[in-house]
Amino acid sequence: ETFKTIISNRALLAIIGAAIVLLLSQFMGQTMNQYLFASYFKNINALSSLSMVGLPLSLGLATVSGVIASKFGKKEFSAFGMFLAAACYGIAYFMKLTNPWIFIGLYVLAGIGVTGFNMFIWAHITDVIDYNEVKFGERNDGVIYGVYSFSRKIGQALAGGLGGYALGFIGFNAAAQEQTTQVLD
């Protein structure tokens, strides 16, 4: 009965999908950036700059996110963050950037969007629990939190391996002094 409720709860399935995509984008981006800055941009120091900029921006966003969400709504704030991230990642991908600083700017903007969504994902879980109660007449807080937490673990595991698989798929060779043009393109 509980399993049937879980697979029938579209809100839960949507938030699980969003969480997995979020984790894949965060962890795969972190994995790929190490190789991107070393092999493509040939500027590993720029990666340090990216790391130093990210934390203060996240902390700054944390201080104002409640006010922004109160004004516009948590769902709207989260959706805007994900659209911002998708747009920035898309621009970075299709422009074939060669300047690491432009890439960092886009990556930081995308990070702000992802962080905005990530800050409210647990608030969305309470909405999923409320939806479950309205739709099925059962609260099931523990089950929903447990299923969601487990799905995040799956997302983290997938993200950890996916970066390596992606590098292998494009032909990256860790032992090579220079990567082939195929890998760099």
PLM regions with names:
Residues 1-185:
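Membrane-embedded alpha-helical bundles of multi-pass transporters/translocases
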